[in-house]
């Protein structure tokens, strides 16, 4: 019998949640996802130094203003890392919009267009890019605009059913519901561990997946933010799963049968009317975990973006 990673690949598209080229080469995922924290981590790897230098050179050619140079360097660095990753995968790279734009639809759209233009100028076509946006109301509206322009989006920091429903209704390409961070919240609140089958994060993604399939939404469900391989295996059959290198290694080393847990119902139920802004805010607000985790996630990504900018500013 093949290892659990090989078996999982037969049921689910496996994506690598990393900006590290060596890990991507090793595990040969279909796609890869990055975020500000992963870009910061990658930027500290010695082999990426030439990418930072090239990004600084680009930024200096665009503007004489130091603050603008820092912004342009960070954007180009994310794109340069994405370009390197694309050399090693057949599918798509997810590159994230600055988390500080999470409540700014126009700002998010402008930043997304800028990132896509940088990729396009380097010969990378839109069908190899996903733009990551936070699943705030403003982020979802930005994605709705971008999707109509042929820019596919990956809606991240998704913790509530309201967020998932609003994303489907906006016609976004893909969502990344977080599993481990949901479990973290309940573990801290209830002071106990959860079996994978009763893990609140696993249950959340399962409910979203089943809802999408029952109502015939085309939005791809990509489970994210895993704490252990038990969570991953409980979601075998999900459209995609984005997995950190350490957990890919664990799956590769694990023997035993992988059972398909999520099955596409291929339903065609009559869809409800799209949520209004007020309905979205109310439904999302009823989920205390989601409210806390979205805010925390945005803050943490913004902190890491700031650290990256400080690192770049010191090199300019």
UniProtKB/Swiss-Prot annotation:
The keyword Transcription does not apply. GO terms for biological process: carbohydrate metabolic process; pentose-phosphate shunt. Pathway: Carbohydrate degradation; pentose phosphate pathway; D-glyceraldehyde 3-phosphate and beta-D-fructose 6-phosphate from D-ribose 5-phosphate and D-xylulose 5-phosphate (non-oxidative stage): step 2/3. It is an enzyme of class 2 (transferase). The keyword Transferase applies. GO terms for cellular component: cytosol. It catalyses: D-sedoheptulose 7-phosphate + D-glyceraldehyde 3-phosphate = D-erythrose 4-phosphate + beta-D-fructose 6-phosphate. It comes from the Bacteria. PROSITE patterns: TRANSALDOLASE_1, TRANSALDOLASE_2. It is found in: Cytoplasm. Its EC number is 2.2.1.2. Keywords: Cytoplasm, Pentose shunt, Schiff base, Transferase. Belongs to the transaldolase family. Type 1 subfamily. Homodimer. Transaldolase is important for the balance of metabolites in the pentose-phosphate pathway. HAMAP family: Transaldolase_1. This is Transaldolase. The gene is tal.
């Amino acid at each position: 019998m093949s290892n659990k990673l090989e078996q999982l690949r037969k049921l689910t598209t496996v994506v690598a949640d990393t900006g590290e080229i060596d890990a991507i080469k090793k595990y040969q995922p279909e796609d890869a996802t990055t975020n500000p924290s992963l870009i910061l981590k990658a930027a500290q790897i010695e082999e990426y130094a030439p990418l930072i230098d090239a990004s600084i050179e680009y930024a200096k050619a665009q503007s004489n203003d130091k603050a603008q140079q820092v912004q342009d360097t960070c954007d180009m660095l994310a794109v340069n890392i994405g370009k390197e990753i694309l050399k090693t995968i057949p599918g798509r790279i997810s590159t994230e919009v600055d988390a500080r734009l999470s409540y700014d639809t126009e700002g998010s759209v402008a930043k997304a267009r800028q990132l896509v233009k940088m990729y396009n100028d380097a010969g990378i076509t839109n069908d190899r890019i996903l733009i990551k946006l936070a699943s705030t109301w403003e982020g979802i509206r930005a994605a709705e605009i971008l999707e109509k322009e042929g820019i596919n989006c990956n809606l991240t920091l998704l913790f509530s059913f309201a967020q998932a429903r609003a994303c489907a209704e906006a016609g976004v390409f893909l969502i990344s519901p977080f599993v481990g961070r949901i479990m973290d919240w309940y573990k801290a609140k209830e002071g106990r561990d959860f079996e994978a089958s009763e893990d609140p994060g696993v249950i959340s993604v399962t409910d979203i997946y089943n809802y999408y399939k029952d109502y015939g939404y085309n939005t791809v469900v990509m489970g994210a933010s895993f704490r252990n391989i038990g969570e991953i295996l409980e979601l075998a059959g999900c459209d995609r799963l984005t997995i950190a290198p350490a957990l890919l290694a664990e799956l590769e080393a694990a023997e035993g049968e992988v059972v398909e847990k999520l099955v596409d119902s291929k339903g065609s139920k009559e869809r409800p009317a799209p949520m209004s802004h007020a309905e979205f805010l109310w439904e999302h607000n009823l989920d205390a975990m989601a409210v806390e985790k979205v805010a925390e996630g945005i803050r943490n990504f913004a902190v890491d973006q700031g650290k990256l900018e400080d690192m770049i500013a010191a090199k300019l």
